């Protein structure tokens, strides 16, 4: 109770603050006075308080709680005001017995309250006074309540009534319904019980026809929006001024939904009803909601309030809800038309609910329900129209019919039925009047005005007030209303004068049938007023054009024609047709029909009228709105000319005359065809046919018009272009084409055709469309179209007719009938059942489907197997029944054995992206142009031996779907031979018995034995298919093989169940007693049937029968031929051996005789190397220097390391065109001599050129040279790969440096060439082209070639000495690599080779050799991997001390310093690699015994160069710290040149190894240290004897040195290693000479290009030779020094000149073929000499900087030259490189001869060596030159290790020690260096 009271208070509070929603602006704009706004708000506050309280307490006691703090009373102004009072305690109902009779302790004034009649929605308030008659007791009032919502009481003014005192409270009566209302108010006191007070009231209809909105029931989150209709009961316009709403959920809106409007929206005309506002209630929470709407108008006075309660129940229960709480039909009169209201419902449940019935309860004849079953969708937010309810007031005879309920029942049982109340106010009665008073006739003659009074009779039960009389616009020209100035009241059941109607006839005859509008308080009434003429209307019926006269047109003389015409009575009175007759000859008339209707009715009934007639031709009367039809007939009677006549119809008002015209002519116009039948069509296909006219007149006829007499827009015509409009007489003329286009009427909703969207198109069409890649919805689309077609067909709408009329000047109405027919098209022109023949499972069969586009637009077609649909079973059943396909046992829904292929070879593509062809697997797209015919192939490829049936869906945008049933049977070919199935068990036996072999033991052999067995087998086709056997094979051979032969071995065919005999012969060869072979039948379909042929022979007769077999007749001839050929070959071999032996012996013999006659020097004289050095320096050192470096191509290494422990003396001055292995050594020597002479003659200028070039463009020259080197290397690579194995023994391939006469040190600051990459495992790409692959054929070849070369040496004193290489201990890499397979094969060969070379060396004067070696000292001191930088300064100092050589130029020093850091990096890289490396393909497959010995003598620490050799194998060297950045590591590029281990094995550490003759490491055996002095003595003898020989041999020109990196201190660019170490001044002249000769012609032996192996001095080059460095020539000429200088990009091959001597197998880094490795590995270690080493050198710019070599050598000092204390000579172990010194390799042209010969000879350990003089290192080079095979000797570490470690007594004569077969086993031969001289 308290809650409801609180709700009322809240409502009151809300009402007090509410605004005129939507009306406030209107009120402002409307100008309505808002008087006493505060007072109105106060009154509204009070009323709303009471109303809300009443609404909350329908059947409960109204509780006045403490929250109610307002008391209501009347003010003087008549408005309701509020005052604040004290709050009350809670209500306590006490069961105190009431006082009875006069004993009541309280008295009410008045005793009871009667409100009498009050309109609904308009409250009235009265005050009640309470008196306390007691003089002692004080009455305490607690509360007051009521049990109805119609009465509302305020609280007491005073809570306590003192004795004799009084108080008061207010009671408000707000009627909600019409009728009596009474209630009892309960007044509760604290001590005196409960007092009652009676209140009464009567509710009457609201004068504004307003009603409360009660009983609305809506679901949550929906709305209730009734329209507030206000009736204006006043005679003045009613203006709504304000309108308020009390609740927050209730707001007011304009009915139109606009935001605002003018005052006209809220102005209601007098006596009219208008909707002024929409009350919109939004239901947010489930509860009972109550609100109020306060309306104020301009007619409201101070006592009049309009308050409309709004009660809405919001619920969450699912169910059916109505949009309105009541169907209010309003006020209706009995003569009004039925009023219709629509019923809208909403389903708030979760399931769809079908509505089953809507009917009135109780049954009411006045209510008509128009309802069709409908389903309400679940959870929709919009109301759905369910039914239309109409109320017919004329049928409401009693008041019970004015109201009731509409009951809605749903199929959902859980939903209760919905009842919607309805009501209507029916006004029973009418206003009567005299009809004649409003009927006026217009005559032909002018008439006077007429005035007629109008009287009305009121039959209503209430008075009718005529407020206004309005004339329509049409009637104002003839009528006026007089005597109506003010409203007229007509009492019930009385008549009264209303106004006078003044009529002024008009001269123009016209009919007026309209209404005068009477505005009354009972709505509006229509008073009919009519003006008539009495005339009849007529018109001629179609197909005549002219309607006002009857025109027969041109008639033939024998023709009779009839025309229909109709007359219509449009007058408000009936007219009698008295008579009708004709005027004229040949005319007749008859009445056809009379009916009610208008013009349209007549035309619609034209076909029936043409056939009908009336037998009764008597006069007729036409009522108003009726018509009569007459037929006029004209008979020509063979008359010619114009015929006129008339028809007259007589009535009381007129005589109607209708003219008749006709032209009668001889002839006629006839349409051909009379009945035009168009072919079947459909939307999208337009059909047409030509219209022809036959002119039988004798004159031309002009066409005037062609038209269609039907209204069907699908029929139309087109005149032909160029057609004349004249019809020639006596001819048939084509005048037009008649078209039928079915698509013109249906538009986008035709029964055929859908838009087609390709998969690339977005679906933008709102309607149904086909999509290329979505087909599961096809059936629905097809079904909808087909249903539309069936509907048309059932209604016979598929047959259409039209009439076309042609009018001419002579004849009219030439009619042709056109018939058209609609059809259901199909794109299939072939049968829908496609049967395939029996098909082999291995094969396919094809059938065609024919397509035709019947439409005039492109049709998109897709063939889709049924299996691709998501639910094929559903589609299958529907399609089979739809297309009447033959029923099959079972459709395979998932088979893909049928596939459609396109026959067209040129696919089309539509603009939308739809392309012909297989869009995806098994789907074929086609585009059919209009009228195009295509065919597609369906291929049936059975998978199993069974019958398969399926459907192929033909998607198209014409009919959506079509289907073709495909049916095929798969089967297999079955073949039997001799009744046996194919397979292993089907043996066809051939058993040869002894009886058949009796000829084997028949010794007489009177005839040839015949062992052939013949068998006949039956071949049967047991399958269903015809088998065509194409071939018969016997174990892969056609028809015959392995003794078996098929006689009738031709192609044959076997039909089903047919058979054939084949004959197979078997002839044994008696090699086995059982022969089992395969007999294979291959069919045209690819099937193979394999049977086993099994032949058996007696085992014991095989031998005898084999002998009995006849031999072939050609056997003897073949035997004789082979024997003769073999004998000839043997003789040829013997002769060749003899010639070769002679070639080997003669040169050796001549050499021995020469040596015997020319002793080299006095043997008794001591071997003084210092003296020899002095002689060579002063005497011919210059010549030797220039000539040797150029002729032999020895490059004194820019870092000519005098102290390198094992100089890789690339000293074998191999002729660039070293002879092939097939030639003997004499040839080799000849070649060498010629080459050396030619090259020596060319190298000097080239060297000069190269020097100059190196200053300017070192890189260019390097590139050129490298290119030459690579080109040559490629030539012989293939040949060498098989012969060379990886020989990586020499860790430092330092060629013996050739010491030239030191020129003044001219430091040259040249642009530093790019540093080379330090050698990685693939350091130098082996250039097999440069290494001799052919080995010498005998061990004497060395001796003979040496003798010849020594003979020729006397003729060429300028040839450079040979570089001799001390065999160094192999690097760990070389050690491990030497363990290959070929290593074992060649282990025994080196000693013989060494002995042979020692013998060879003895024949040469030692002193000459020393001179030659001195000349080559610069190059002989090639930087070997084991060179120790720490000993180099000592050696250099020793050289200076003993020989007085100038110090190395600063530039050379800096070059050396630049070279060192890179070498250091290489060393570091080597350190990282374990020394124990497995054999690699880079090494030779064998290890010489010398090398093995030296390996055993190696210290535990392998020289860092050795480590580098192995290390370089595993990784790319680090970048150097030189001036230039390192080129990227080149192992990959190298690997291009090292495809196999043999390639790298061909390369030595020196640049020229590959191009050089066989490496000298074979020829330079290093023995265990015996006596150092003895060893050196023997060496001196050798070098002296070989001096001249070596001069002759040096042919490689000295290349120009590329410029070295610029160092802080100037030093010789590209200075040789020896120049840096020895601090010698650079030889400017030699530099220039070298530079000038930098470019050699091809005739010159170009190292690395023309076959002349370049100097392989740089230890960084990975020497593959045994004892080689293991690095393949990365540090060749250039890299030997330049790399040591840190020149990362300088090609080690040369200084850039084209001189062959400049190039090593390692091509220029700039060359396209090869990219050198990064850092220079002077000693086989990848270290950078440019960094810390040369930084010191550059700071000091003196020799002292070289003392820092140890600092950068992370390895032991024995990696470098032997210390002074090392008595053992360090033998350079350069591989098969030419004797290009390291200097020349590095391209230090200025320093080629700038330094003195090594201070300490390459074989002398130190100044303090036991030798009294320094031995020139070039002696070794000279010796090395003699080795024409492998010149890569093992590097002997000559560092601080013990002397016996690597130092060995060098016996120069052992170079020529005989090595049996050594040449032939050498991987490097001179064969690849052809002679060019």
Curated annotation (Swiss-Prot):
UniProt biased composition (Low complexity): 1233-1258, 1420-1432, 1609-1646
Matches recorded under InterPro entries: Ig-like_fold (IPR013783), Ig_TMEM131_2 (IPR056311), Ig_TMEM131L_3 (IPR055435), Ig_TMEM131L_4 (IPR055436), Ig_TMEM131L_5 (IPR055437), TMEM131-like (IPR039877), TMEM131-like_Ig_dom2 (IPR045695), TMEM131-like_N (IPR022113)
Sequence segments annotated as region (PapD-L domain): 107-281
Lumenal topological domain: 21-1115
Phosphoserine: residues bearing it: 1318, 1338, 1371, 1857, 1865
Residue span of region Disordered: 1197-1573, 1590-1655, 1679-1707, 1830-1852
Membrane topology label: Single-pass type I membrane protein
Domain of life: Eukaryota
Transmembrane regions: 1116-1136
Pfam families: Ig_TMEM131_2, Ig_TMEM131L_2nd, Ig_TMEM131L_3, Ig_TMEM131L_4, Ig_TMEM131L_5, TMEM131_like_N
Domain topic, free-text comment: Possesses a PapD-like (PapD-L) domain similar to PapD domains involved in assembly and secretion of bacterial pilus components. The PapD-L domain can bind collagens and is probably involved in collagen assembly and secretion.
Job description of the protein: Collagen binding transmembrane protein involved in collagen secretion by recruiting the ER-to-Golgi transport complex TRAPPIII. May play a role in the immune response to viral infection.
PANTHER family: RW1 PROTEIN HOMOLOG (PTHR22050), TRANSMEMBRANE PROTEIN 131 (PTHR22050:SF1)
Name used for this protein in its record: Transmembrane protein 131
Species per Swiss-Prot/TrEMBL record: Mus musculus
